[in-house]
Amino acid sequence: QIEAGRRAMTRNVRRGGKTWVRIFPDKPVTLRAAETRMGSGKGNPEYWVAVVKPGRILYEMGGVAENIARKAISIAASKMPIRTQFIISG
């Protein structure tokens, strides 16, 4: 989802500005194989997730007009399973 949002933003901005992804998936999620008996330890890491708490900045853009950035980030936000908000700093 992070990568899908990043791709959508860069495709929308084209060669305008620069995009930064401010989150990184650093928590492994382990899964056991289907129909495995109980016991014998923990399953293997299947994929990685990023835990996002409220107030965390997900993406950052620079060198782009505000209306283009707002449109690009709203497209990226539609790919996220959480409620997001567009903020302007500086």
UniProtKB/Swiss-Prot annotation:
GO terms for cellular component: chloroplast; mitochondrial large ribosomal subunit. It comes from Oenothera ammophila. Its main location: plastid. Keywords: Chloroplast, Plastid, Ribonucleoprotein, Ribosomal protein. SUPFAM superfamilies: Ribosomal protein L16p/L10e. Part of the 50S ribosomal subunit. Belongs to the universal ribosomal protein uL16 family. GO terms for biological process: mitochondrial translation. Gene3D superfamilies: Ribosomal protein L10e/L16. This is Large ribosomal subunit protein uL16c. The gene is rpl16. NCBIfam families: rplP_bact.
